[in-house]
Swiss-Prot record:
<dbReference type="GO" id="GO:0005096">
    <property type="term" value="F:GTPase activator activity"/>
</dbReference>
<protein>
    <recommendedName>
        <fullName>Signal-induced proliferation-associated 1-like protein 2</fullName>
    </recommendedName>
</protein>
<feature type="compositionally biased region" description="Basic and acidic residues">
    <location>
        <begin position="1"/>
        <end position="12"/>
    </location>
</feature>
<dbReference type="InterPro" id="IPR035974">
    <property type="entry name" value="Rap/Ran-GAP_sf"/>
</dbReference>
<dbReference type="GO" id="GO:0098928">
    <property type="term" value="P:presynaptic signal transduction"/>
</dbReference>
<dbReference type="Pfam" id="PF11881">
    <property type="entry name" value="SPAR_C"/>
</dbReference>
<feature type="modified residue" description="Phosphoserine">
    <location>
        <position position="1549"/>
    </location>
</feature>
<feature type="compositionally biased region" description="Basic and acidic residues">
    <location>
        <begin position="1194"/>
        <end position="1217"/>
    </location>
</feature>
<feature type="modified residue" description="Phosphoserine">
    <location>
        <position position="383"/>
    </location>
</feature>
<feature type="compositionally biased region" description="Polar residues">
    <location>
        <begin position="360"/>
        <end position="377"/>
    </location>
</feature>
<feature type="modified residue" description="Phosphoserine">
    <location>
        <position position="148"/>
    </location>
</feature>
<feature type="region of interest" description="Disordered">
    <location>
        <begin position="42"/>
        <end position="72"/>
    </location>
</feature>
<feature type="region of interest" description="Disordered">
    <location>
        <begin position="1067"/>
        <end position="1245"/>
    </location>
</feature>
<feature type="modified residue" description="Phosphoserine">
    <location>
        <position position="1552"/>
    </location>
</feature>
<feature type="modified residue" description="Phosphoserine">
    <location>
        <position position="1472"/>
    </location>
</feature>
<feature type="modified residue" description="Phosphoserine">
    <location>
        <position position="1461"/>
    </location>
</feature>
<feature type="domain" description="Rap-GAP">
    <location>
        <begin position="595"/>
        <end position="812"/>
    </location>
</feature>
Length: 1722
């Protein structure tokens, strides 16, 4: 037997080797450990060791004596010192030896010894009690551990130290019986971390309490009440092996007190102990749970932390004594941050000794063999270590997740849907009962963020940043070390130095170093140069990065041409490295080639994937291998997945298949995805051997594949890895087909991965099936590629890679070196001068903070998802901010520096806010204020955020705060000189905390309630930019995933396609999908979008927040500020299409397109839909670039003239306002600023989707979450339609409307009719938005002045079968006034005086209540339509009849209100499909925004009217002085002019807020198109009347409520649009609802002609309006002409193609005849 001490030390060095030794050595080691510790204890403690030893031995079962010795042992046990073993302990050692035979790790053995006496429960509880008493009498913890007075000595089961195993107890001990997991019968023994104690359930209830009595720790009282199932946990926590604690702590000379518990776990200790007290005390009660969770995580996920005490110490040491270079060294990538030279030293010896262990499917299959013994210490093969020494596996029970695809299996972890990236930040997802699965999945799937596992390179050159961000999209490839290209990128082919050597501690090492000039050195003053370093050891992590020359203390002068001595650079960066051992590499090209191989050894872009075919009723490996041929469903799947290739002669990646003799089959399946080549080993394509049931020829290939796809036909039994026997198969992706070989074929996916394979994306949405489509194919290919990459991180493959790496390094160090050492001399480096220079040139303070790479700090981060604190490494580069958990070595948080909006810094902590106000809370490890100061300074350098400001707000006499806030938490308006204004609150400020509650966790409604109800309102705000625009994250301003403009055949950017893409139909399994709109989807028969929307269900709220964009973006490209992305709230049915996708997929960024003004405005999506459009035959369907141009110009002109461009509230138009522009008076504070963003699902993928349209929100348009506004009445959605609501009725069109209005169904139940401002708009907007830009929200937006560019979508003919979103329905409200002909039956909204016109889009799923009654109002927007595209006619469109949603009945209304409501989704889908054709996003104006301003203005116009809600909830308005009016804005017709340009100009939230305040617009007055022939005099009169109305609350009723022209130049379009313009079809253009007569009528209706003169603005507006109308008319004419030309061109094209084909055929015939004739002649 080898010397125990020696082996022990080796184990320590290796860190993880402990479990790999056989029992005998382990015993010896343990003895050694124990002896050393005992000795130490004797020295320090009173009782003699001998006595203790004898007692413990004799007692053997828990006698009191036992306890005594145990105490001392425990005290020092964790300390691995060099004391020699003592004889005193011999007896105990002997006993220990017995236990050791079963112990798994050295720690376990130690523990067992320590626990021997007491652990033994065989003696019964009495003994135990005596034991405790005795121990207590003899020594109190106070005596032994001064710092831990209350820790019971209780030696027994308290071990919490990492490797000790509870199950290491005497074979005879009764404990064994108790130490069995009641669920599995498995012996509970320690794995790593304190988890072992957690798993230990041996204690009986009485024993447990006896133990508690012994400890006498009050803290545990509450635990006693915990269900008995957790005793093991208590065991682990309660005075958790104070000895172990003490051991580790003593080794450092410190104790840790965590919430009253001594909890020292080697895996968790690190620096945490020091910090924990600080953090933990803040939340003492949650500690246990969090610890429990944490432990569990450590145990199940990271065997890496099974450290022996020595390794622990090294880690602790590392945490305490960071490298000198840590701060100044800028890391290139994530794995470099994880590089730990101390760990490399400790594990070096282990490299050659790592054994292959049973992993993958074999581990699972072997557990069954000894059925009863799964839980025993012995594995099926005889040794747990054999089974999985990597984790010291005890019988793993699996994760308990099962479904009809896959069953829970030992040693495997399942992904059944809903799993997402870990979230530690404080966000709504973590704060509410969020279906984390869905939300995470979707967000991660659709968001522009890089997933945690997808973050690799942190240093991104400025010129590559846009491209880099674009790469972060659809289906991110994860777990790939892209930093491996560091050498190739920065060294290869350039002047640099390589040094190789064999370090006595590190083994073979290789260093590459290069000095380079810093490109962007202006701010860095002296930092003209930096040194790039790549340092490689046998460990797989490499130190890669750069250090600025000014940050290096040196004897030489900085900034000279010669540079600093390399020796000084290396000594500073890697002080642990022995520079003397390094020799310069030989000058051979082979050196660089070898280094490239070494660095890129882990990169592979060729993967082989197995595919097993499982028929109905099958589940076993043998059955699957014996399926000789594929069925039609499997063939269909294979055709989708890749292309069949003939193997013979195949020259690409063949994955060991025979391409010469067909011995492995004649064909195989091959495909490529991104940069990857995939060859599939398909079981049915590999040779079948009828006489060999095992089908070895097939298994030979598939069994050696790491990732296997298991294809299940309907009726197949759930898959379990237990049925597979293979050491290599680590991941199984199960794909089950539904409705095979039909148009509705779809697939559900599940994953089962070996427990040591980290999770990987893309996440599987919960309860969703994927339609057969290219998107599903991309999803599946990304999943298997990520699975392969992740599997290579498992211990088995890492061990193999490490051995290979070590050999490479050895070869370099031995065969490719010269005798030259590292150059230490520098010309003229005199010692004296050097010393002076060193002082003088001492690293320039904070020079490193200007580095491009990631500067790293040790911090403690608050994990809000698990309510725990975790020790992390914080890295901040020029592109990313990320946190890596030290224990798991996983990235747990990342965000782009561009998304950081602010931070709150304290002395030793900092809270960083990003995106929409989400935040991460960090504190320094050693309460080091310097760290926080540096972090803040670094943030200032790399982000556009700022320090937050805390202020306490007072209420005025009316209880108002004096400002409005939109759903995003952005202050839309502040009452001048009010209390809020005096406190320093300004428009554009962003609230991130209200009364200590993070705004990111609140819905708009909750936010408003908090502001309204809190006695003292304390807010933390982020000040706006200098120009007054709110600070926004980049992902809010523009959806990153707009990239990869490479289009696929469908015209959709390939990268963007997501499984949820609009062309795909996702079905939420549980819910029936609504009938999809017919659309050209790649797969015939697949409905355009189905339930996919459900996917989005994630949270409506989530999306809403970010609707607004920062107006700063010049191009307005931001499609949706918030990335509103995926979150459109799909209805419960989820059937709604996924809106967000559209944004991604369908359009590149519409905004961008618009911006360009290029005709291509049609987004890809639009193009995709072109077919549909054509079907509708609305030429207008297509967007032409010009309109956008035009609009932009109008906008600019008008706005600029006004100067309101930025300020005009109109700009605020919220696109998202689906709902009636969420007048959120409910917002109270937010006071209508909020637009309902929620409702509007942005990016739902509908054509109408603003995102698609590219009309992203105009200037900060904040889409309110409809939440607060829900109560709003559907403010008349139709601007024009406002007729009902507005006094002015559009008589001329009234009849038409009448029909539509007639939707009498709802009439019957007027009371029931609710238009939720949010929902109605959502619905209508949703529909409208989707279908027609004119939707409620749209309309309202329009009216608000937002110009909504019509969506190009043509009105789909009814044939499409869905209501035309373009239809407008008018609902009259309580106001008795009805528009003639329009809703003949007024609907009374309770409390609402106004009538509203509601344009609902019929949700696809919901039957239109009286469709027949509803008539389309095709003419409404005709003029605008042209521009916006007939499809947009949304509101007005005639198809509405059938499709129109009538007024909603109460039930429908409620449904709409529910985010999940299928109606909403359907509507949404529908609209989006039609309406969204236009690439531009329609702009929606939010009443609320306006109202805020107007209220503030105090002018009667007060926007208050603008929001319907306002009237209803006047009190909501925080400060408005004027009574709120319900005014519904008339929906704007799509302002055909391109909204895109508008977009830029107005970003709602931001701009509008500010603008509003500047311009008071009395409610917006809709201006009719000149086409209507409206007389200007009438217009003036109307305006006056309008003003007069303002004075009257009823004015609020005016649906019009159009904003000022100036602000709403776009809105003027609305009227025009409203005029039932010509249908795309060429329907005659209906005069605007308001004709001159109508105009008068309008005034008449108003009845109150207000004499008040309009200010000079009217004249100005008139001029602008005339010009705009003229331009508009011209544009329309041009557009009509262009449309006609396009149509002709198409026809000509078709004709030419036919003629071409005919000519070709004739030519062919002629040729044949010619040659035939010649042949005959010859």
């Amino acid at each position: 037997m080898s010397d125990p001490r020696q082996s022990q030390e080796e184990k320590h060095k290796l860190g993880r080797a402990s479990s790999k030794f056989k029992d005998p050595p382990r015993i010896m080691q343990s003895d050694d450990y124990f002896a050393r510790k005992f000795k130490a204890i004797n020295g320090n403690m009173g009782p003699t060791t001998s006595l203790n030893a004898s007692n413990s031995n004799e007692t053997g079962g828990g006698g009191p004596a036992n306890g005594t010795p145990a105490v001392p042992k425990m005290g020092v046990r964790a300390r691995v010192s060099e004391w020699p073993p003592k004889k005193d302990c011999s007896k105990e050692l002997t006993c220990k030896a017995l236990w050791e035979s079963r112990s798994q790790t050295s720690y376990e053995s130690i523990t067992s010894v320590l626990q021997n006496g007491q652990s033994d429960q065989s003696e019964g509880q009495q003994d135990e009690q005596l034991d405790l008493d005795f121990v207590e009498a003899k020594y109190t913890i106070g005596d032994i551990f001064v710092h831990s007075p209350q820790r019971g000595l209780h030696p027994i089961r308290q071990r919490s130290n990492s490797d000790v195993t509870i199950s290491d107890i005497d074979a005879e001990d009764v404990l064994d019986q108790n130490a069995v997991n009641p669920n599995t019968g498995a012996a509970l023994h320690r794995e790593y971390g304190s988890t072992s104690s957690i798993d230990r359930q041996g204690l009986s209830g009485e024993n447990f309490f006896a133990m508690l009595r012994g400890y006498r720790v009050e803290n545990y009282d509450h635990k006693a009440m915990v269900p008995f199932g957790f005793p093991e946990f208590f065991r682990c926590d309660p005075a958790i092996s104070p000895s172990l604690h003490a051991a580790a702590q003593i080794s450092r000379g410190e104790f840790v007190r965590i919430s009253g518990l001594d909890y020292v776990d080697s895996a968790l200790l690190m620096g945490r102990d020091r910090d924990k007290p600080f953090k933990r005390r803040l939340k003492s009660e949650s500690v246990e749970t969090s610890l429990f969770r944490k432990l569990r995580t450590v145990k199940s996920e990271h065997e890496t932390f099974k450290f022996t005490s020595e390794l622990e110490e090294s880690r602790l040491e590392r945490g305490i004594r960071p490298w000198n270079c840590q701060r100044c060294f800028a890391h290139y990538d994530v794995q470099s941050i994880l590089f730990n030279i101390n760990e490399a030293m400790a594990t070096r010896a282990n490299v050659g000794k790592r054994k292959n262990i049973t992993t993958g499917a074999s581990a699972a299959s072997q557990t069954q063999m000894p059925t009863g013994q799964t839980g025993n210490c012995e594995s099926p093969l005889g040794s747990k270590e054999d089974l999985n020494s990597k984790e010291n596996l005890d019988a793993d029970e699996g994760d308990g997740k099962s479904n009809d695809l896959v069953l829970s299996c030992p040693y495997f972890r399942n992904e059944t849907g809903g799993e997402g990236d870990r979230r530690i930040a404080l966000s709504r997802a973590n704060s509410s009962s969020f279906s984390s699965g869905e939300s995470c999945s979707f967000e991660s799937s659709l968001s522009s963020h890089c997933t945690n596992a997808g973050v690799s390179v942190l240093e991104v050159p400025r010129e590559n940043q846009p491209i880099h961000r674009e790469k972060v999209k659809r289906y991110i490839i994860e777990h790939i070390d892209l930093g491996a290209y560091y050498y190739r990128k920065f060294f290869y082919g350039k002047e640099h130095q390589n040094y190789f050597g064999i370090d006595e501690n590190l083994g073979p090492v290789a260093v590459s170093i290069r000095r380079e000039k810093v490109e962007d050195a202006k701010e860095k003053e002296g930092s003209q140069f930096n040194y790039r370093v790549a340092f490689r050891t046998s460990e797989l992590t490499t130190l890669r990065g750069a250090i600025l020359e000014d940050a290096i203390p040196s004897t030489a002068r900085h900034g000279t041409a010669r540079g600093l001595p390399l020796k000084e650079v290396l000594e500073y960066v890697i002080p642990e490295l022995s520079i003397q051992c390094l020799r310069q590499a030989s000058n051979s090209p082979k050196v660089s080639e070898q280094l490239l191989k070494l660095d890129e050894q882990g990169l592979s872009f060729q993967h082989k994937i197995g595919i097993l075919y499982c028929k109905a009723g099958q589940s076993t490996e043998e059955e699957m291998y014996n399926n000789e041929t594929a069925g039609p469903a499997f063939e269909e799947f294979l055709d989708l997945l890749g292309q069949r290739v003939r193997l013979k002669g195949f020259s690409k990646y063949r994955a060991q298949l025979d391409n010469k003799t067909d011995s492995t089959g004649t064909h195989s399946l091959y495909t490529t995805y991104k940069d990857y080549e995939l060859m599939f080993h398909v079981s049915t394509l590999l040779p079948y051997m009828p006489n060999n049931r095992q089908q070895l020829l097939r298994k030979r290939h598939i069994g050696n594949d790491i990732v296997t796809i298991v294809f299940q036909e309907p009726g197949a039994l759930p898959f379990t890895p237990k049925s597979i026997r293979s050491h290599f198969q680590h991941v199984f992706v199960i794909v089950k087909v539904h409705n095979p070989c039909t148009e509705n074929v779809c697939y559900s996916v599940g994953v089962s991965r070996s427990k040591d394979v980290p999770p990987f994306g893309p996440p599987i949405p919960k309860g969703v099936t994927f339609p057969k489509s290219a998107v599903f194919r991309d999803f599946l290919l990304a999943k298997v590629i990520n699975a392969e990459n992740a599997a290579h991180k498992s211990e088995k493959f890492r061990a193999m890679a490490t051995r290979t790496r070590q050999e490479y390094l050895k070869d370099l160090a031995e065969n490719f070196v010269t005798t030259a050492t590292v150059d230490t001399s520098v010309k003229f480096s005199f010692i004296t001068l050097g010393a002076k220079k060193k002082e003088k040139v001492k690293p320039r303070k904070d020079a490193h903070l200007f580095s491009i790479g990631a500067i790293m700090w040790h911090v403690i981060a608050r994990d809000f998802g698990q309510s725990a604190d975790i020790e992390c490494l914080l890295g901040i580069s020029n592109e990313f901010i990320m946190l890596i958990e030290k224990d798991s070595k996983n990235v747990v948080f990342n965000c782009s520096c561009r998304d950081v909006i602010g931070w709150t810094s304290g002395l030793v902590s900092i809270k960083v806010f990003y995106e929409r106000g989400e935040c991460v809370l960090l504190s320094s490890v050693d309460n080091c204020a310097e760290d926080i100061r540096e972090i803040v300074q670094r943030l200032v350098i790399v982000t556009r955020g700022c320090e937050t400001v805390e202020m306490t707000l007072r209420r005025n006499g009316l209880g108002q705060l004096g400002f409005h806030v939109n759903f995003e938490g952005i202050v839309a308006d502040v009452e001048p000189f009010g209390f809020a204004w005096k406190a320093g609150l300004r428009q554009g400020s962003r609230l991130v905390e209200i009364c200590k509650v993070a705004v990111a966790t609140l819905t708009h409604e909750q936010m408003i309630d908090l502001l309204r109800t809190s006695v003292t309102v304390k807010v933390v705000i982020i000040q706006p930019h200098d120009d007054g625009s709110p600070r926004r994250g980049c992902s809010e301003l523009c959806r990153i995933p707009m990239v990869e403009y490479k289009l696929d055949s469908e015209g959709t950017p390939c990268e963007y396609k997501t499984p949820f893409r609009r062309n795909t139909t996702w079905h939420r399994v549980p819910t029936p999908a609504l009938q999809p709109l017919s659309r050209a989807s790649p797969i015939p028969g697949t409905p355009d979008r189905l339930p996919c929307q459900q996917l989005l269900q994630q949270a409506q709220a989530a999306i809403p927040r970010s609707t607004s964009f920062d107006r700063k973006l010049p191009d307005g490209t931001r499609s949706s500020p918030s990335n509103q992305s995926s979150s459109s709230d799909p209805g419960p049915g989820g059937s709604g299409p996924w809106r967000p996708q559209v944004g991604y997929d369908g359009c590149q960024s519409p905004l961008l397109l618009e911006h360009q003004g290029s005709g291509p405005l049609e987004c890809d999506g639009a193009r995709e839909r072109e077919d549909t459009m054509e079907a509708s035959r609305h030429p207008e369907t297509k967007w032409h670039g010009p309109p956008s141009k035009v609009l932009g110009s109008y906008k600019e002109r008008a706005l600029q003239k006004d100067g309101s461009c930025k300020d005009s509230p109109n700009k605020l138009s919220h696109i998202g306002d689906k709902s009636c522009s969420s007048h959120s008076s409910s917002n109270t504070l937010s006071s209508n600023t909020s637009s309902n963003s929620d409702d509007k699902h942005f990016g739902s993928g509908d054509l109408m989707d603003p995102e698609l349209l590219g009309l992203t929100y105009i200037k900060g348009a904040s889409t309110d979450s409809g939440i607060d506004t829900a109560p709003c009445m559907p403010a008349t959605i139709l601007g024009p339609v406002h007729l009902a609501g507005s006094r002015s009725l559009i008589h001329s069109r009234a009849e038409q409307w009448a029909d539509a209005a007639d939707v009498s169904g709802p009439d019957d139940e007027p009371a029931k009719l609710y238009s939720v401002h949010g929902y109605a708009s959502t619905i209508s907007a949703g529909s409208a938005a989707e279908g027609s830009m004119g939707d409620l929200s749209e309309i309202s937006s329009h009216s608000s002045g937002s110009h909504h560019s019509g969506s190009p979508s043509a009105h789909c003919s009814k044939s499409s079968g869905s209501l035309d979103s373009s239809k407008v329905y008018i609902v009259s409200h309580s106001s008795g006034q009805q528009v003639p002909g329009s809703m003949s039956k007024p609907y009374h909204r309770q409390g609402a005086v106004n009538k509203y016109v509601i344009g609902w889009k019929k949700s696809e799923g919901s039957p239109p209540p009286e469709e027949p009654e509803v008539t389309e109002c095709p003419g409404m927007y005709s003029e605008m339509d042209v521009m916006s595209t007939a499809t947009q006619h949304q509101t007005v469109v005639g198809d509405a009849v059938a499709e129109t949603q009538h007024v909603l009945s109460k039930e429908d209304f409620l449904k709409l209100m529910l985010p999940d409501s299928p109606l909403v989704e359907e509507g949404r889908r529908k609209f989006s499909f039609y309406g969204n054709l236009s690439p531009r996003r329609s702009l929606y104006r939010t009443l609320s925004d306006e109202s805020i301003c107007s209220n503030r203005r105090g002018s009667s116009f007060g926007s208050s009217r603008s929001s319907v809600l306002d009237q209803a909830l006047p009190n909501d308005i925080l400060f408005s002085t004027t009574p709120p009016y319900h005014s519904t804005l008339p929906p704007r017709a799509h302002p055909a002019p391109s909204m895109g340009s508008l977009r830029n100009e107005f970003w709602f939230s931001d701009g509008s807020l500010s603008d509003k305040s500047k311009c008071a617009d009395p409610g917006l007055m809709p201006l009719p198109d000149t086409a209507t022939g409206l007389d200007w005099t009438h217009l003036v009169d109307a305006a006056r009347a309008f003003e007069g109305l303002d004075s009257d609350e009823e004015l609020g009723l005016l649906c019009h409520h159009t904003s000022y022209l100036d602000q709403r130049v776009a809105s003027f379009c609305t009227l025009t649009d409203m005029q039932h313009g010509q249908d795309l079809e060429g329907a005659q253009e209906l005069p605007l609802c308001v004709d001159p007569g109508s105009g008068k009528e309008f005034m008449d209706t108003t009845g109150e002609r207000s004499p008040s003169p309009l200010t000079g603005k009217v004249n100005q507006l008139e001029l602008i309006l005339r010009q705009l109308q003229t331009d508009l008319r011209k544009e329309k004419q041009d557009k009509a002409v262009l449309q006609a030309e396009v149509q002709h061109l198409r026809q000509d094209n078709m004709r030419l193609q036919e003629e071409s084909q005919t000519a070709t055929a004739q030519l062919r015939k002629f040729t044949e005849w010619f040659f035939t004739t010649i042949d005959k002649k010859s």
